[in-house]
Amino acid sequence: MQIENRLNAAAASGDGLGNLAGRSADPTGAADKGESGVPVPPTGFVDPTPRISLSADALLYLGRAKRTPEKLPPLTKDEWNNRLSPQLAAREHQAFGRLAETGDYRAYYRAFIDYYDGLRPEDQNSLRYFGTREAAVAGLRSLDYDADSGLDMDAEFENLVSVFLEEDKIAPSPATTTMSPAERAFFAWDASNISYEVDAPEPRPMTEIERLYSELL
């Protein structure tokens, strides 16, 4: 009888077994939330805002995914090896080169990045274009730095992308890497007169074999 009376009293006060779903699992946390009114972030949450140092333009062009497929014609073998053809020169001038003539370098870098993203992946890794996208992003960042620091743009502003494109990136042929006998003789060491003794002896005359060997070099 006493047990029945206690169950009826608990049900009347809302603490019975039938009201478990309506009660908070953590009354302390509920009280804290009600008092502060501000949701508490998860324990492992880290705000990345203080770590962002790139500008909006640089972040846009550095991290964006390519949305359009390749729309430019493939490079020829000579163009891939950084031998500029009239057709490629015309495409580059129309895409981004003309903007450098007007002095709008921000538009120049943006246009080059759009042009680069339109190339095939194998053409992006060619001798002509390898590393040029990173140079364009660096150019955008330098413009933002100059604007934030209040520096005036120099008339002889260095086009980073143009420097990369005009650089001699032609792969050396085996014929150019081999040295002639005269060049090898110039860099050859004559060890016959080298001595590590304190009192070096007089250089001895060369034998016939040594003389023939030195002439071959």
Curated annotation (Swiss-Prot):
The keyword Transcription applies. Residues 14-49 are annotated as: Disordered. Keywords: Transcription, Transcription regulation. May be part of a system that R.meliloti uses to respond to plant (alfalfa) biotin signals. This is Biotin transport regulator. It comes from Rhizobium meliloti (strain 1021). The lineage of its organism: Bacteria, Pseudomonadati, Pseudomonadota, Alphaproteobacteria, Hyphomicrobiales.
